[in-house]
Amino acid sequence: MKKVIVALGVLAFANVLMATDVKALVKGCAACHGVKFEKKALGKSKIVNMMSEKEIEEDLMAFKSGANKNPVMTAQAKKLSDEDIKALAKYIPTLK
């Protein structure tokens, strides 16, 4: 029983360490999109905090794959893991 408890503790701690630091990720976005994602980047983009979680995730995945043609966003999205993208998509709509 003791081994099971120790193993569960290790797994829980490892999960915390692997969790995406969303606040660190959004710092790189603020210059163009605003701290609360309230701006149109370069006067062109959608206002991201008005988008749904699903829309944000789909757009970031499309930028990452190159399906959305925008060299700046494609370069940024390629740096993100799928987990990072899901975390951002979940977090950004909370900034309204």
From Swiss-Prot:
What Gene Ontology cellular-component terms does the record carry?
Answer: periplasmic space
Modification after translation is described as: Binds 1 heme c group covalently per subunit.
Question: What is the top-level taxon of the source organism?
Answer: Bacteria
- Subcellular location field: Periplasm
Signal sequence span is 1-19
Kindly give the InterPro entries that the UniProt entry links to this protein: Cyt_c-like_dom, Cyt_c-like_dom_sf, Cyt_C_IC, Cytochrome_c_Oxidase_Subunit
Annotated keywords = Electron transport, Heme, Iron, Metal-binding, Periplasm, Signal, Transport
GO MF terms on file? electron transfer activity; heme binding; iron ion binding
Among its keywords, does the record have Heme? yes
Indicate which residues the UniProt annotation says bind heme c. C29, C32, H33, M73
Q: Name one Pfam family in it.
A: Cytochrom_C
Function, in words: Natural electron acceptor for a formate dehydrogenase.
- Family to which this protein belongs: Belongs to the cytochrome c family.
PANTHER family in the record, alphabetically?
Answer: CBB3-TYPE CYTOCHROME C OXIDASE SUBUNIT FIXP (PTHR33751), CYTOCHROME C4 (PTHR33751:SF9)
Q: What is this protein called?
A: Cytochrome c-553
- Origin organism is Helicobacter pylori (strain J99 / ATCC 700824)
| Lineage of the species this protein comes from | Bacteria, Pseudomonadati, Campylobacterota, Epsilonproteobacteria, Campylobacterales
